[in-house]
Amino acid sequence: METIQSVITEWSDSKSWDHLFQHNFKDSNWSELFDPVNFKFKFGTTPFSQFQILPSVISLYLVIIFSIKFLMRNRKPFSLKYVSILHNAILCIWSLVMCVGILYEVIKRITAEGPLFTVCETVSGFDKGPAYYWSYIFYISKFYELLDTVIIVLKKKPLIFLHVYHHCIVVWLCWYFMYSGWNLQLWVVFLNTFVHVFMYYFYFQTGRGKTVWWKKYITMIQIIQFICLGIAGLLHSAAINLNSSPCFTHYPAFISAYLINFSFLFLFSQFFVKSYSNKPTSSSSTTTPTKTKKID
């Protein structure tokens, strides 16, 4: 009860929010983008760490996509074939680099100090060093991923709630992970980039007009991803309560992450059931690019 009460107090106390608005984008130290060894997330000076960026970018994103959708209502869709191919190739390669990067750095730390830090980070280790640098690059990538939706509306493809909700909430959540220093972000980055390698490769191939038979398995591994994150959360809770050495945690981030994780699990499962239930086997074995709905 004490923990829940402290979370409610922190969320409701206006003074705890005042410092979020005391930094400007012009204060950014851009050299931090290229220094993984000495990386430390510094609120206000690390590029894109300023809180004001989030409501500004998310609001602009929503205005742009729904304005384009309105303006395109009586127009023919743009092809954007080569733009889509390039965009998805960039995100496939970027996801692969982040996945390999964070896996390499986490394995290095596991070799040196054991695996406990992946669910129980001490105050001296959180939110700094090469592993968390890849988490930061992951956060930066979420801004670029917003172009997914711009391409969708220009091509007049179906725009579903899950897609827009996911893009809006993930930008904020990744920032919150970095801001709070919550160490389960390492799990999030590895699992999500692993899934995205296959997902953006799928979109790259369908953009080229290729048939991809394993479309439905992408949604399945996304669902498995959220289940794995739930298990990681249980291990984190156990480590906090049972481990003799102090684990650093941030309860508002923990609760926010798992409420959002549950919402994703529900929405992706619902999407999977609607998309693949009560369909003939033959229809799920082929994919045409024109009917592909981008959900992530």
Swiss-Prot record:
GO cellular component, one term: endoplasmic reticulum membrane
Keywords per UniProt: Fatty acid biosynthesis, Fatty acid metabolism, Lipid biosynthesis, Lipid metabolism, Membrane, Transferase, Transmembrane, Transmembrane helix
Biased composition (Low complexity): 277-290
Reaction catalysed by this enzyme: a very-long-chain acyl-CoA + malonyl-CoA + H(+) = a very-long-chain 3-oxoacyl-CoA + CO2 + CoA
InterPro entries: ELO_CS (IPR030457), ELO_fam (IPR002076)
Stretches for region Disordered: 277-296
EC assignment: 2.3.1.199
Gene Ontology biological-process entries: fatty acid elongation, monounsaturated fatty acid; fatty acid elongation, polyunsaturated fatty acid; fatty acid elongation, saturated fatty acid; sphingolipid biosynthetic process; very long-chain fatty acid biosynthetic process
Primary location class: membrane
TM segment ranges: 51-71, 83-103, 134-154, 159-179, 184-204, 220-240, 253-273
Membrane topology: Multi-pass membrane protein
One of the record's GO molecular function terms: fatty acid elongase activity
Annotated localization: Membrane
Function: Could be implicated in synthesis of very long chain fatty acids.
Entry similarity comment: Belongs to the ELO family.
Protein's UniProt name: Putative fatty acid elongase DDB_G0272012
Organism: Dictyostelium discoideum
